[in-house]
């Protein structure tokens, strides 16, 4: 699918394969006698492996000059180097044979598959981080709620303290009434508990180890035989890329839901914090009043 | 292959068309040129106009405008993907300065076939491009939501900082309250003790007075 990133526009016309020729599929051609497909060796640079020396570097066939695996390896790595270099050292893409371009297409397809798999891995890492973040946010939300409950408890204790301070004035002193600007209500209970449920669900998944399993590898594809031609291999890579992209799309969907949940959780916490601010302000004011009353009692 | 989704395309510098390509005849070049005149050249952005079941898509960047006229059955994203490809190719070929000095329609012969190739490529790979566009859109959606979340988290952080200051203040006030409570308790305990001792003293004094009055002195043998 994404094997070749550049459009046919980037390949000059003289290099295109004539589809009206006797061969039905230009990729099947191993016959290099046709001048349409090949260039004279004189035009090649020394760094390029000569096609006369080998039948197909990608089809797993033997190199004719020698059976040594080292020479085969060096040829293959040389090709890889050229692909990475976009054939700059060997006259550019225009001056390559069909066979080399087939190899290049396979190489590019594999590279693209690798990058899609890389994206998928990154997305999975982000998902696991997002899960942890969501769990952490939920815990922090609960901490804020607990803090708010504590503020309510402080309010109750303070009310008792104020009563006692009021009764300590003595017989002839005027009674002390603490000022209350507003009642302390405690945490606002929201009906929507979906993030909580979601977090519990995610925690369960995490404990079961379901989130860490990469989904990209779930689809098993039969490996192609060694004799498979470049076209089949590119098609297989395209299929892998399609699978990777659909997995990536699924993960991104999950990430979106998680991001929305994070947003709603943070928003809920912000609202809770606003209420807590007001309650803490009220407590501060009342403790200050009680302190003034205490000082007055001590001063008598 | 005879693609019929893309009708007409051009690349312009300002309002001067440098290269154009079409396989059809019609009034779309003049409509596109009119649209080009109205484009705000200063901003780098994308514009789409609809006219008679056709979309006129523009991509403006660095003083150059890239346009494609397509049938409205073709999605906007595909048209934009085409314009992005044309832009990249145009910059690659003429970025060195040739484009800035080129006269009207002087690049037709060179760049026209290139635009044709891009049209064919985009139409041939529309499904694949749409898949990629969908994933890109999902990524940007998640990114925008997360950017909002970051803003919210920053607000939350500020809220927590303010709350920390307030609770710190409350803690110091509460410590003061506790200290004063202890002092008040101690003071009241002393007061209480003092009262008890005074009452006890008075009682003892009363007992003593009664004793003296009954016994006419301290000798009470009778």
UniProtKB/Swiss-Prot annotation, chain A:
| Example of a GO biological process term | membrane fusion
The molecular function GO annotations come to:
SNAP receptor activity
Q: Which InterPro entries match?
A: NPSN/SNAP25-like_N_SNARE (IPR044766), T_SNARE_dom (IPR000727)
Task: Please give the Gene3D superfamilies that the UniProt record associates with this protein.
Answer: 1.20.5.110
Superkingdom, according to UniProt?
Eukaryota
Q: Where in the cell is it found?
A: Membrane
Q: Which SUPFAM superfamilies match?
A: SNARE fusion complex
* Tissue-wise expression: Ubiquitous, with a strong expression in root tips, ovules, very young leaves, vascular tissue, hydathodes, stipules and the abscission and dehiscence zones of the siliques.
What spans are recorded as compositionally biased (Basic and acidic residues)? 190-208
PROSITE patterns named among the record's database cross-references: T_SNARE
Q: Its GO CC terms?
A: cell plate; plasma membrane; SNARE complex
- Locate the t-SNARE coiled-coil homology domain: which residues? 235-297
> According to the UniProt entry, which residues carry Phosphoserine?
29
The annotated regions of Polar residues compositional bias extend over: 38-49
Which UniProt keywords are listed?
A: Cell cycle, Cell division, Coiled coil, Membrane, Phosphoprotein, Protein transport, Transport
Assembly mode: Interacts with the cytokinesis-specific syntaxin KNOLLE and with SYP121. Binds to EXO70B2.
Query: According to its UniProt entry, what is the function of this protein?
Result: t-SNARE involved in diverse vesicle trafficking and membrane fusion processes, including cell plate formation. May function in the secretory pathway.
Family the entry assigns: Belongs to the SNAP-25 family.
Q: What protein am I looking at?
A: SNAP25 homologous protein SNAP33
From what organism does this protein derive? Arabidopsis thaliana
Curated annotation (Swiss-Prot), chain B:
Q: What is its main location?
A: membrane
**Tissue specificity annotation:** Expressed in flowers, leaves, stems and roots.
Query: Which keywords accompany this UniProt record?
Result: Cell membrane, Coiled coil, Endosome, Membrane, Protein transport, Transmembrane, Transmembrane helix, Transport
Q: Which residues lie on this side of the membrane: Cytoplasmic?
A: 1-197
Q: Which Pfam families match?
A: Longin (PF13774), Synaptobrevin (PF00957)
Xref: SMART domains: Longin
Topologically, how does it sit relative to the membrane?
Answer: Single-pass type IV membrane protein
Domain Longin: where? 10-115
Residues in domain v-SNARE coiled-coil homology? 131-191
What ranges does the Vesicular topological domain annotation cover? 219-222
Q: Which GO terms describe its cellular component?
A: early endosome membrane; plasma membrane
Q: Does the keyword rRNA-binding apply?
A: no
An example GO biological process term is: protein transport
User: What does the UniProt entry say about where the protein is found?
Assistant: Cell membrane; Early endosome membrane
Q: Which InterPro entries match?
A: Longin-like_dom_sf (IPR011012), Longin_dom (IPR010908), Synaptobrevin-like (IPR001388), Synaptobrevin-like_transport (IPR051097), V_SNARE_CC (IPR042855)
Transmembrane segment boundaries: 198-218
Report the protein's function: Involved in the targeting and/or fusion of transport vesicles to their target membrane.
Report the sequence similarity comment from the record. Belongs to the synaptobrevin family.
According to UniProt, the name of this protein is Vesicle-associated membrane protein 724
| Species this protein is from | Arabidopsis thaliana
